[in-house]
Amino acid sequence: MPHESRVGRRRSTTPHHISDVAIELFAAHGFTDVSVDDIARAAGIARRTLFRYYASKNAIPWGDFSTHLAQLQGLLDNIDSRIQLRDALRAALLAFNTFDESETIRHRKRMRVILQTPELQAYSMTMYAGWREVIAKFVARRSGGKTTDFMPQTVAWTMLGVALSAYEHWLRDESVSLTEALGAAFDVVGAGLDRLNQ
């Protein structure tokens, strides 16, 4: 891959900056053809500095995902307990996936890399597990059960399916907003969630 020089003052190093730089490279050249050295060079940092933020190249497209999971946890924790499970999950899912207009283009590139790169799919399953754990904990708390119980796990897997199907649709059809796609996908399974409150 050709090396690209950077002009101007280097921005401070953050996981977000490194991931943004990498996403642009992956989108332009393909995940396989971009090396860790390419990313470090484009970000204006040393290879060893990059590995202080990310354990592997596969982790980079996900950005600071632990922070995002904490945000999802916070959204769920702040939902009034009187709100029905279906409405609570729908509200949290939409809020978690709402971005400023300026972020939409970059987020589309990021999700295209994550969902459409075969080499990333095994790693992505480990990341999805963390996301499902947050959902399952919330459902278990609402139902008075354990996170590992069948019902919370089933709801968590279902919510992952909702999110992934919505993102796939959003990537295929750029005329559809992400919130529209997520809302429509959620409503397909919403009736089943309603029955959990009965």
Curated annotation (Swiss-Prot):
Superkingdom of the organism of origin: Bacteria
Taxon lineage: Bacteria, Bacillati, Actinomycetota, Actinomycetes, Mycobacteriales
Full protein name: Putative mycofactocin biosynthesis transcriptional regulator MftR
Annotated organism of origin: Mycobacterium tuberculosis (strain ATCC 25618 / H37Rv)
Family annotation (NCBIfam families): mycofact_TetR
Keyword Transcription regulation found: yes
Pfam families referenced in this protein's UniProt entry, alphabetically: TetR_C_14, TetR_N
Cited function: May regulate a gene cluster involved in mycofactocin expression. Mycofactocin is a conserved polypeptide that might serve as an electron carrier.
GO process terms (BP): regulation of DNA-templated transcription
DNA-binding region per Swiss-Prot/TrEMBL record: 35-54
